[in-house]
């Protein structure tokens, strides 16, 4: 696995790796690896899990109007989200057909926007006009809706340091770009990423840290009189 600092870098690495694997910029296909980015209780898949794509089916779209902040004022826009029918193993390893939110899969962002989340909810309400909100039937239908509960995932060939926590791999490639400083956050990130390798570690843009990295020479200052 490749570990890097930003979602933008991870997305770029994933795109390049898939081009090398498949000979071009191809859509999601069978045997691709996904990294779950949000708990999906319907399938028992947790944030940070890696799952293989067992099969890929048809693509579909769902739309809804929302009021979004544009240029400092609210405007009514229509948001369209793209979905792919896929089969992945559930928490017990059994194949489960479900929907995957394609917009997030190749996005530089960590998650979908508030407006996109709102569009998912409004779209559900539009598809179920007979259900009243704040009822058990509404909650049950929402819990089992394939679009509202679509898998939110990224390609799992390259991940951020945040997402790699708790995982270990035999071979790990770490790109320290964006985390080469000596501040506490950078050092913690570097430690976490570096220690994910069980056997072999490959590095890029490694921070230059020596025993004197934090050594500083201060200007001579006048001391108070010593009695």
Which ranges hold each PLM region?
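Core RecA-like ATPase module of SF1/SF2 helicases and allied nucleic-acid translocases
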Residues: 1-225
């Amino acid at each position: 696995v490749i570990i890097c600092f930003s979602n933008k870098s991870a997305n770029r690495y994933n795109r390049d790796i898939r081009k090398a694997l498949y000979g071009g910029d191809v859509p999601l296909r069978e045997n691709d690896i996904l990294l779950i980015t949000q708990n999906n209780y319907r399938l028992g898949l947790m944030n940070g899990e890696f799952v293989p794509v067992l099969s890929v089916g048809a693509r579909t779209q769902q739309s809804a109007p929302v009021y979004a902040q544009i240029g400092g004022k609210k405007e009514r826009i229509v948001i369209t989200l793209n979905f792919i029918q896929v089969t992945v193993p559930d928490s017990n390893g059994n194949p489960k057909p479900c929907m995957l939110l394609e917009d997030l899969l190749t996005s530089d962002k960590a998650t979908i926007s508030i407006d996109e989340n709102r569009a998912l909810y409004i779209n559900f309400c539009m598809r179920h006009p007979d259900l009243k909100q704040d009822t058990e039937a509404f909650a049950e239908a929402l819990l089992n809706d394939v679009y509202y509960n679509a898998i939110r995932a990224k390609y799992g060939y390259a991940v951020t340091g945040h997402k790699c926590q708790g995982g270990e791999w035999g071979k790990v490639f770490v790109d320290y770009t964006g985390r080469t400083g000596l501040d506490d956050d950078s050092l913690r990130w570097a430690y976490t990423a570096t220690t994910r390798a069980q056997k072999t570690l490959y590095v890029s843009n490694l921070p230059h840290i020596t025993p004197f990295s934090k050594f500083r020479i201060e200007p001579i200052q006048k001391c108070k009189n010593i009695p």
